[in-house]
Amino acid sequence: MTDKTFDSIAYFTKLCEENKTCRDNKFVATTCSGPDTVQGVLQKFRKASNFIMVSDTVDSNTHSAGEGFFERYGYTVWILAAYKRDDMEDREKKLNLCRYIFRQFISRMLRDKYREAFEGQLEFLKLTQIYSSELGRWSMNGVTGLYFMM
């Protein structure tokens, strides 16, 4: 039996490094343990202002389908960009950048899944429905972006 557990941290770190838009806008990949524990950002905030944050914890669901039980994992990724304080035009520009990167990531994940890239780890990901939510205007001081779950 082969282990096809999806390594979300390694995968999204690779996407961040290979994505031209991320490189051009100096996005840094880091980890967190949910929105309340952003230790990766705190460790790197002096050197970077744009982040791809991958949660190092997963939500899971065990369910029965026929005769066996299966586990389904939910992975969360944040795309965050800092904007100039009290500058709503800059905030909108940075939010649009995060949206654009999100669409690029989705395209790449679909491509990788069907080409069996990343050692086939994306094989069992359900990419037909990906939930995303944008940060509200006052969610994090001076930072905008979105998170998505798959």
Q: Where do the model's predicted regions map?
A:
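Acidic-leaning, charged glycine-interspersed low-complexity segments
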Residues: 6, 19-24, 50, 95-149
